[in-house]
């Protein structure tokens, strides 16, 4: 039998913080464990799995993990790691212990996600049109106009249904019972959804008996929902939209996902060289002549989309694409300029957006955030670097950040120099006690910190599959779940009532 009996909560140092002006007070607690309560007993919705897991041997679980890795590698479910001396292609480590939500928990999350994404789309429309939120003094104009993701080329450009972020990946963490926080909004080219679907397929292949014990909400219909969403935001004059997936190419870290989604939706996977613009319309080169393209699910960043409008050295985009987009002849999902809403410098204002545009209180809370561009916040951050997580406002993938409690004095002092040189580029947040989930590691089953990325589709209506991609920090004590930093993934179960 495996060393499941050793599974227990990891201790965490209790700390508190009280900044000036905002008077936030966040107390570090023992991490909330998804499976076990404070007494060490399995939570009701985990009891069946808990009993099943105790009966599995280390040998069997190790063999199952090796089988999953072999299948993922054969199928090509890998991602690229740039600058990695060990090789450019890796499988994302898959953990066989699922993360389980009750139907009630998911109901709360789904309501909060719908609310948040709706407000974010309203915000993007507003900043490129009437600027009411700036006029109301809720967000300073310079926070938007000086944002590297703000695209003045999109001023007064209308998009179908006024939806700019058709696909959103919202990163959520849990700090306690029913205590969910949004850690980050991903509105440009959110990735990871293919791993959500493939993780479910793998769990059903490895442990089919578990799905006889639980009624788990399905996720495999995500590509169908995505295609339905993309077709619903077609240009107004189009009857039967032609949808394509635009990829930077096979060397992109998420190329598997691009090809997977195109194949599952039954649409063409194209690169920039496969498309051209004529008379402000986009066409695809085919063996039977040019074919008009109406909706592009683009997995290429703004800067590389159009060499005539953005980076002139880009070979990944399509010359003239911006003009076709502005003319309303092609829909880009997501629209150019959506990044203005997911930049970390804008993140602190999302609760205000929800109240301003929807007249509602946020269902999902933000993590308290200090904006280092503000003198008081900077002073507090500098005095508490050993307790905080400090991030670049334009950063991604777990790079360019400091996790104070996990850093050495030398690392903290080195980071202090960067922060003082460019305080406007940083935000800081308390080090939350992210929830843990049992994870199969070399020593047996042990708690590891996790987050959740649900995928929200906004078209004619807002839809999502139950759950999302659970990411896990495989290193003991680590809070960094990104695959580029050694993180893995888990299947996410939402139980049906």
Question: Could you tell me what each predicted segment is?
Answer:
Residues 2-497:
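Preference for protein termini
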């Amino acid at each position: 039998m495996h060393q499941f009996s050793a599974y227990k909560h990891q201790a965490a140092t209790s700390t508190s913080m009280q900044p000036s002006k905002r008077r936030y007070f966040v107390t570090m607690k023992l991490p909330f464990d998804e499976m076990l309560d404070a007494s060490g007993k399995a939570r009701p919705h985990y009891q069946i799995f808990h009993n099943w897991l105790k009966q599995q041997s280390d040998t069997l679980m190790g063999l199952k993990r090796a089988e999953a890795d072999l299948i993922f590698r054969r199928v090509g479910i890998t991602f690229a790691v740039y600058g990695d001396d060990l090789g450019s292609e890796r499988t994302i480590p898959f953990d066989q212990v699922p993360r389980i939500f009750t139907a009630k928990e998911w109901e709360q999350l789904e309501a909060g996600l719908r609310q948040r994404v709706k407000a974010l789309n309203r915000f993007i429309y507003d900043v490129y049109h009437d600027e009411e939120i700036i006029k109301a003094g809720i967000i300073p104009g310079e926070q938007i106009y000086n944002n590297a993701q703000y695209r003045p080329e999109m001023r007064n450009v209308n998009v179908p249904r006024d939806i700019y972020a058709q696909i959103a990946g919202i990163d959520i963490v849990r700090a306690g019972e029913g205590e969910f926080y949004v850690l980050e909004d991903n509105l440009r080219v959110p990735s990871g959804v293919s791993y959500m679907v493939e993780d479910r397929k793998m769990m059903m292949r490895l442990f089919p008996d578990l799905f006889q014990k639980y009624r788990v909400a399905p996720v495999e219909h995500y590509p169908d929902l995505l295609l339905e969403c993309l077709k619903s935001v077609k240009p107004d004059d189009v009857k039967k939209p032609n949808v394509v997936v635009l990829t930077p190419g096979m060397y992109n870290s998420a190329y598997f996902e691009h090809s997977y989604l195109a194949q599952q939706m039954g649409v063409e996977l194209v690169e920039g060289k496969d498309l051209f613009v004529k008379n402000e319309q986009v066409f695809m080169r085919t063996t039977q002549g040019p074919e008009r393209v109406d909706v592009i699910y683009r997995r290429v960043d703004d800067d590389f989309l159009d060499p005539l409008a953005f980076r002139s050295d880009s070979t990944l985009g399509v010359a003239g694409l911006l003009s076709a987009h502005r003319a309303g002849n092609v829909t880009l999902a997501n629209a150019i300029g959506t990044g203005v809403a997911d930049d970390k410098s804008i993140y602190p204002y999302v609760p205000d957006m929800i109240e301003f545009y929807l007249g509602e209180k946020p269902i999902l809370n933000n993590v308290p955030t200090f904006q280092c561009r503000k003198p008081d916040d900077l002073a507090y951050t500098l005095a508490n670097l050993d307790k905080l997580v400090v991030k670049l406002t334009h950063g991604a993938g777990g790079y360019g950040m400091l996790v104070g409690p996990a850093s050495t004095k030398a690392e903290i002092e080195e980071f202090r120099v960067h922060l003082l040189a460019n305080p406007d580029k940083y935000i800081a947040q308390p080090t939350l006690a992210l929830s843990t989930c049992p994870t199969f590691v070399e020593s047996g089953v042990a708690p590891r910190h996790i987050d959740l990325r649900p995928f929200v589709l906004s078209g004619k209506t807002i839809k999502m599959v139950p759950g999302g991609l659970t990411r896990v920090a495989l290193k003991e004590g680590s809070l960094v779940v990104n695959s580029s930093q050694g993180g893995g993934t888990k299947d996410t179960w939402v139980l049906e009532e």
